[in-house]
Amino acid sequence: MNNHSEAESSGHGDNDTIPGWNEELELAFSAYKGSYVPGRVASRHKTVCDVLLPAAVVQAGISGALQKIGKQPVVGDFVVVLDQPELGSRMIVNILPRKTCLSRGAAGDGGGEQVIAANIDTIFIVTATGKDLNLRRLERYLAIVYSSGARPVILLNKIDLEDNPIRLVEKIQSIAGNVPVIPLSALSKTGLEALSPHLNPGETVALVGSSGVGKSTLINSLLGETVQRTGGIREDDEKGRHTTTVRQMFLLPNGAVLIDNPGIREIQLGDSAEGIEKAFSEIVDAASNCKFKDCTHRDEPGCAVLKAVKDGIIPEERLASYHRLTDELAFQSRKSEIGLKRLEKERFKKIAVDIKKYKKSTGKL
């Protein structure tokens, strides 16, 4: 947790002091005794995590056993820490069950998903007036957030730079459905009071959005102090300079928890099929009246979605965006399958090499 110094004493204490801790987590942790303490990951570095324990904020490594099975703690995770300060050792040995996961498609050729934050109740999708406002990008974010299990809220920042912000709010609302859209200025603190219903004590809120939309300024305004460096606005492209380098967790004065995520540079979909359906609910609703159950809504006869587009009920660009995201999801799935097959092939190849080495060493070749 930001603004805490590492305590010299043991991290043992009242578990309820860990933000977001509840009875379900207490039950999950009850099997651990002795030097094991619960904690919550506040920020993640390459090989260590900053972990909020009941009575201290410490740096803890990640056990080899966790790494071997591919379990990686992320910001927001509730974890089990083997706390042995007298030996100079603190190690994350397990991750308690996650109630929500914010994921995205992993970068690179292997496909798959990358979890970037966990145990989030609400996600603020932050955009800004000017060139950053992109409805297609917001649709992507909505699909990702819906898939996480968290509640989405869209924040339109920098309204002080816009003559008619209500027009932009209506534009965003046209693709957001029932998702709240809140106009504000983090710099002048205009409209921040509208965030109160979404910042409840003990709940966790994460901020996502592209670089330069003002997330750091928003955090500073909500905390009432400068804890995140901001980069100002470049006049040539109306964007703030990208400044956040690691995810961090902050405790607001009312007891709500705020997680800041760096601007997602590669907004790829993970396993977001359900999220896409929720983000494009009007298309899914219309599809229930299609002639064919496996209709792709491209050129099939009797397609109710294409009819809705023709009748002006569904905007053509919405359907085009839906197709782009579903095509991308299918591509990601194929890429992931290819990656798994490659790993399986490499595993069998290694087994064959090991068998050959064994036979050679025992003279059975």
UniProtKB/Swiss-Prot annotation:
Detail which positions bind GTP. N157, K158, I159, D160, G209, S210, S211, G212, V213, G214, K215, S216, T217
Q: What is its main location?
A: cytoplasm
Give the cofactors, semicolon-separated.
Answer: Zn(2+)
Entry's transmembrane regions: none
What are the GO MF terms of this UniProt record?
GTP binding; GTPase activity; metal ion binding; rRNA binding
* Sequence positions that bind Zn(2+): C290, C295, H297, C303
Q: What class of enzyme is it?
A: hydrolase
* The keyword Metal-binding is annotated on this UniProt entry: yes
Entry keyword Lyase: no
Subcellular location per the Swiss-Prot or TrEMBL entry: Cytoplasm
> Per the annotation, how and in what number is the cofactor bound?
Binds 1 zinc ion per subunit.
Which residue range or ranges hold the CP-type G domain? 112-267
Tree of life domain: Archaea
Q: Which HAMAP family match?
A: GTPase_RsgA
PANTHER family the record matches: SMALL RIBOSOMAL SUBUNIT BIOGENESIS GTPASE RSGA (PTHR32120:SF10)
Please give the function described in this protein's UniProt entry: One of several proteins that assist in the late maturation steps of the functional core of the 30S ribosomal subunit. Helps release RbfA from mature subunits. May play a role in the assembly of ribosomal proteins into the subunit. Circularly permuted GTPase that catalyzes slow GTP hydrolysis, GTPase activity is stimulated by the 30S ribosomal subunit.
According to its UniProt record, which protein family does this protein belong to?
Answer: Belongs to the TRAFAC class YlqF/YawG GTPase family. RsgA subfamily.
The cross-references to NCBIfam families, in alphabetical order and at most eight, read: ribosome small subunit-dependent GTPase A
Quaternary structure annotation from Swiss-Prot or TrEMBL: Monomer. Associates with 30S ribosomal subunit, binds 16S rRNA.
Q: What is this protein called in UniProt? A: Small ribosomal subunit biogenesis GTPase RsgA
Organism equals Methanosarcina mazei (strain ATCC BAA-159 / DSM 3647 / Goe1 / Go1 / JCM 11833 / OCM 88)
